[in-house]
Amino acid sequence: MGCLFRTRPVEETYSKAPLKESTQAALIESISQQAQKIQSLQATVDIDTSVGGAKKGHVTDYKEIRGYVLARKPAMLHMIGLLPIVRTTAFDMVSDGQEFKLWIPPKNRFVVGRNDVQTPDSDQPMESIRPQDIYDALLIRPIDPDHDIAVLENGYEFLHDSKGHRVLQEDYELVVIRKRATGWTLSRKIVFSRVDLQPHRQYIYDEQGNVATDARYASYKEYDGVGFPSRIELFRPHEEYDITLNILKLEINKPLRDDQFALQQPPGAEVVHLDKPQSSAAVPLADSRSKR
């Protein structure tokens, strides 16, 4: 009958790194403790940004720029990016958790709107970015016992060893289900490395169960006695943009004033209201004042 089978090598092997054990309760508690330790942060960062993908048919990589990030609970964020070499402002954005403002000096555009207003087809890539999405990736929220159910899954991830070989490594995956007005929905998945039991990835889902944010965390360091990732990558698949923050300096729990999260409308700027129909969204400053 001839040979009915053949033997072939297995390409993936398991990582030989020593792995730590934990439990569902311990991982939930670690998220809560980390959240309690950080009430505010102020960071100097290098920002890498890419825009595009299958929908646009191409990807544009932007030159790395220096930036500053301020965050304060419960939902305040202020992020500034500086143009290379000249170090003038490339963008300036603030959010109070509900509404945001975005100032883009090179285009003389001042954008305002709610964080839940999406513009995925915008010809202005910066206008697809929402400060609230950055905030949610930056500071992992604790599990809310009144609204969340967290289920532990033993999973695995693909890594590369020191020789560049592809290996499998077991991880812990905390799947968070949230109670909403429409019922229970998939909210988040937090992936913990079994090497250090730190969150190394977080998926945030929309109410339809689609991945809204894919955040990766790497190179944890101690800042003011608190362990925090020095590299955070945020990918938004629907809007097709990717932002990586490489932290150069981080101060935790320093007092931050309300005026540090304020952004005034510059005189002469083109004002874009994303809450309005796109045909009437952009109005000159004089017109926007006359309609008040």
Report residues per predicted region.
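An acidic-aromatic
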Residues: F5, P74-D136, A269
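Envelope-exposed proteins and targeting segments
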Residues: Q39-L41, I65, A75, T89-F91, ...
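Flexible, processing/modification-adjacent segments and terminal tails
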Residues: S22-A25, I104-L186, Q265
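A mature extracytoplasmic/lumenal domain signature
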Residues: V45-I47, K73-A75, G81-I85, G97-E99, ...
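Extended lipid/amphipathic-ligand handling interfaces
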Residues: S30, R66-A71, M93, A215-E222
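Post-signal peptide N-terminal segment of secreted/secretory-pathway proteins
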Residues: I47-D92, E99, S288-S290
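N-terminal leader/targeting segments and the immediate start of mature chains
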Residues: G2-E64, K276-R292
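Gly/Pro-enriched, hydrophobic low-complexity segments
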Residues: A150-G268, V272-P277
